[in-house]
UniProtKB/Swiss-Prot annotation:
Family statement drawn from the similarity comment of this UniProt entry: Belongs to the PTH family.
Role, per record: Hydrolyzes ribosome-free peptidyl-tRNAs (with 1 or more amino acids incorporated), which drop off the ribosome during protein synthesis, or as a result of ribosome stalling. Catalyzes the release of premature peptidyl moieties from peptidyl-tRNA molecules trapped in stalled 50S ribosomal subunits, and thus maintains levels of free tRNAs and 50S ribosomes.
Gene name, Swiss-Prot/TrEMBL: pth
Protein name per its UniProtKB record: Peptidyl-tRNA hydrolase
Cellular component aspect of the GO annotation: cytoplasm
NCBIfam families the UniProt entry points to: pth (TIGR00447)
UniProt site positions, description: Stabilizes the basic form of H active site to accept a proton: 86
Organism: Helicobacter pylori (strain P12)
Cell location: Cytoplasm
Gene3D superfamilies for this protein: Peptidyl-tRNA hydrolase
Assembly and oligomerization: Monomer.
Length: 186
């Protein structure tokens, strides 16, 4: 079993902000698979079970994401953990994968690292860096960024679909890494 976590902040106030990239990508995946999330008060998260994957969207706010992840991890005992999250150190249009390592100042990852360790897989989606970090991550994408954001989120969703079928992180990493921003043709 694999625990697949999309990071974000709950409530409509934060819907579709840069920091909610993980939520948006998991929502798109679940929608395409014609499934739905149900709320689990036990884990304070929305859950969706598909094959041998538990998809999880913590409802604790970003800085406490580790609480939901730890609860689900202790209950389901997954063999693997994959976190889908925004990364402001990567330009918009870039997707990278990583196993373990530092949290890059990402408070959701800090919370998970503190409670669960940092030896998990990551799907990192670039959101670019703004002048004011907090204002930037909590802002929505600009209208001129939408086509690129949509293409990158679609790419990340396809990477997750591939991972669900293959169970092969290295193959997903090799096939779906975008080291340079995705080029959108008009």
């Amino acid at each position: 079993m694999t625990l697949l976590v999309g990071l974000g902040n709950p409530t409509l106030r934060y819907a579709h902000t840069r920091h909610n990239a993980g939520f948006d990508i998991l929502d798109s995946l679940v929608s395409e698979l014609d499934l739905s999330f149900t709320f689990s008060s036990k884990h304070n998260a929305y859950l969706c079970v598909y094959k041998d994957f538990i998809l999880l969207k913590p409802q604790t706010y970003m800085n406490l994401s580790g609480e939901s992840v730890l609860s689900a991890k202790n209950f389901y005992k997954p063999k693997e953990l994959l976190i889908v999250h925004d990364d402001l150190d990567l330009p918009l249009g870039v997707v990278r994968f990583k196993k373990g390592g530092g949290n890059g100042g990402h408070n959701g990852l800090k919370s998970i690292d503190l409670l669960c360790s940092n030896s998990y897989y990551r799907l990192r989606v670039g959101i670019s860096k703004g002048i004011d970090v907090i204002e930037h991550v909590l802002s929505k994408f600009h209208k001129n960024e939408e086509p690129l954001k949509n293409a990158v989120f679609e790419h990340a969703k396809n990477a997750l679909k591939f991972f669900i079928e293959s169970h092969d992180f290295n193959a997903m990493q090799n096939r779906f890494t975008l080291k340079k921003p995705l080029i959108i043709e008009s």
